[in-house]
């Protein structure tokens, strides 16, 4: 779990793992959703997290001048991701979708908003605690990306309400 005291490379690795955990959760939720709209929404959210993972990987590799490209690719496939964004255990999220059937897009969006808001709060806290300037910049960028996700999710909720 991130603390804000990591060096830049470690912060990127930890952030990557959390993004991967969230991506995997959204993919599982898509498979278990009770409606095609919820499946589509979770599938789209999973792709958002893939974009975050690619961003983090590109930063990591640019710092190392692409020296570890093959190693990072292997790491990304093998790395277990027990935590989702915000440090939420993936198993807790999985229990949430087991406890009730996600029957519509609104349910899917509400779960996603909770995850993204928790993630935003974590990255904000980490940016405030970061000892390395470079790590602070990364945490602030991740926080901004989570803000964008929350804005997009809220816009999607408004569109559903209009239907």
Give the location of each predicted region.
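Non-heme di-metal
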Residues: 1-163
């Amino acid at each position: 779990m991130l603390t804000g005291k990591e060096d830049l490379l470690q912060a990127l690795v930890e952030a990557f793992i959390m993004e991967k955990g969230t991506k995997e959760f959204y993919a599982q939720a898509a498979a278990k959703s009770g409606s095609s709209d919820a499946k589509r929404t979770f599938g789209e959210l999973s792709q958002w997290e893939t974009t975050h993972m690619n961003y983090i990987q590109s930063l990591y590799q640019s710092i190392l001048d692409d020296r570890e490209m093959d190693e990072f690719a292997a790491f990304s496939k093998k790395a277990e991701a027990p935590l989702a964004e915000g440090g939420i255990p993936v198993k807790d999220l999985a229990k949430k979708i087991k406890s009730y059937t996600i029957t519509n897009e609104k349910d899917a969006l509400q779960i996603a908003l909770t995850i993204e808001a928790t993630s935003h709060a974590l990255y904000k806290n980490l940016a405030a605690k970061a000892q390395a300037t470079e790590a602070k910049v990364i945490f602030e960028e991740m926080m901004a990306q989570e803000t964008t996700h929350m804005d997009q999710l809220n816009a999607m909720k408004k569109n559903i309400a209009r239907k």
